[in-house]
Amino acid sequence: MALGLMCQFLEPRVKRDGSVVYENVIDEKLLQLGAYKNGKYSTERILETYRYNVKEILRTIPYLVRENIKSFRLSSTIFPLYEFCGDIARGDGIIQQDLAEAGRIFREHGIRVTTHPGQFCVISSDKENVIENSIRELEYHAYLFDAMGFDRTPFYAINIHGGKGNRSEKLIETYNYLPENVKSRLTLENDEKCYNVKQLLAISERIGVPVVFDSHHYNFGVDDLPFDVAFRETLATWGSVKPLQHISNTEIGMENAAYNQKRAHSEMIRYIPPLQLEAIRGNLVDVDVEAKLKNIALLKMREDFQIAN
């Protein structure tokens, strides 16, 4: 079993008034599209940013090892503006060397690595430019995993939502067009807005893509399969690869709030569906812990639910 950490690692800092705040120790640098288009970034500045962010991956790994965290979701913005400046990353020997070293260390410590491209990655869109941009984003994540030496299997998942609803034929068409290093790692996650588990299973049956079961999204879905059926059948889509799932909760006190407030991730995990908890304890799945307090929530979840490292 692995509980997965999402992109950040928080450490406590005591303020002058004695209160405690949590700060992310992963210091990723960003670049702004507007500034780039206005010519404010030199090639040297972009390269410096890319090299720095890759070094941050290497600096993150000891924190994961310290807490015995065996699954980690990489940020999607290690190479900001990659769609415009990807050649700078791909052509730099230092970046390639550091990515290869990071991949080697992740594998040495048995840490699963995944990514989750953002909400604008929509391979079922009715706009061709959106699909083209989405494919470029997926190719970026695949390049990253290739450079780290990761196998081309969904164990190293590039996980997305289905995107625009009622467009399953377009989703399948785009999937079949994807390059092999993307397609072999791609997974689809259920949500309450566009594609529920039942719909994703129908897609998976046709193209073989694994389904990431998100129990929180499932709770807000409509016209879906019973929980036990959805849970069991999503596991079956993974074949011989260990399934990846997600867990998150509604924040305490928000149970009767507006819809979007109920959907938002809580700071900590206070409830796990019994079937999912059984699978976690039985080492049948890896589960990304989608909570605002990141590793703090992950470690507390281990303790509260008696989950072995």
Regions found by a protein language model. Give the residues of each.
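Alpha/beta catalytic barrel-like cores
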Residues: M1-R112, C121-S124, N129-S134, H141-Y143, ...
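Conserved, mostly hydrophobic/aromatic
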Residues: H116, D214, V287
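Short linear capping/connector segments at secondary-structure termini
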Residues: G118-F120, I160
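Short, glycine/acidic-enriched loop or turn micro-motifs at the edges of active sites
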Residues: Q119, E192, H217
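Loop-centered beta-sheet repeat module
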Residues: A157, G162-L171
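Betabetaalpha-Me/HNH-type nuclease active-site subdomain
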Residues: E189-N190, E205
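Short acidic, Gly/Ser-rich segments with clustered Asp/Glu that frequently serve as metal-coordination loops
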Residues: Y195-N196, H216-V222
